[in-house]
Amino acid sequence: MKLHDLRPAEGSHRKRKRIGRGHGSGKVKTGGKGMMGQKARSGPGPYRTFEGGQNRLVKRMPFKRGFTNKFRVEYEVVNVGSLVDWPTELEVTPETLLARRLVRRKKMPVKILGDGELNQPLVIKAHKFSASARQKIEAAGGKAIDLTWIVERHSRSRGPNPSMRNARQS
């Protein structure tokens, strides 16, 4: 067997149909594009939201401004006024607030706000305090202690940038 004897298997290669090249081809006149109209013409079709000339839905909806911050941190909020009946010997922590059902979710940071009055000295540990809450706690003789909160971010990354894989490392 020599190179000039090599042939593809019988029936494995079909000739491509040349459209619009005579009646024998079976694809004459409109060339498989149907009747006339925008879809029969060359070039890209109408834009994605095109509705045949009527005012499209996208234009009829109210215009949305701004953006959604994907790094936003939501807090469980507790007002100073809800700590009035709290025993002074017990520290106020996210765990004790959860046990007394003043907060619902334990995986969220806690912020203390200054709505209401506080008349006993309390040691309050939270992730964030409003300025008025801190002022009311310290005026009552208590302490406002900040806790650190480590935010769990879910990365969409699948490892290093593939375009940088073959780059020279210096």
Curated annotation (Swiss-Prot):
InterPro entries: Ribosomal_uL15, Ribosomal_uL15/eL18, Ribosomal_uL15/eL18_sf, Ribosomal_uL15_bac-type, Ribosomal_uL15_CS. One of its GO terms (biological process) is translation. The keyword Iron-sulfur does not apply. GO terms for cellular component: cytosolic large ribosomal subunit. Residues 1-12 have a biased composition (Basic and acidic residues). SUPFAM superfamilies: Ribosomal proteins L15p and L18e. It holds the Pfam family Ribosomal_L27A. Residues 1-50 are annotated as: Disordered. One of its GO terms (molecular function) is rRNA binding. Keywords: Ribonucleoprotein, Ribosomal protein, RNA-binding, rRNA-binding. The keyword Mitochondrion does not apply. Residues 13-26 have a biased composition (Basic residues). Belongs to the universal ribosomal protein uL15 family. Part of the 50S ribosomal subunit. Binds to the 23S rRNA. This is Large ribosomal subunit protein uL15. The gene is rplO.
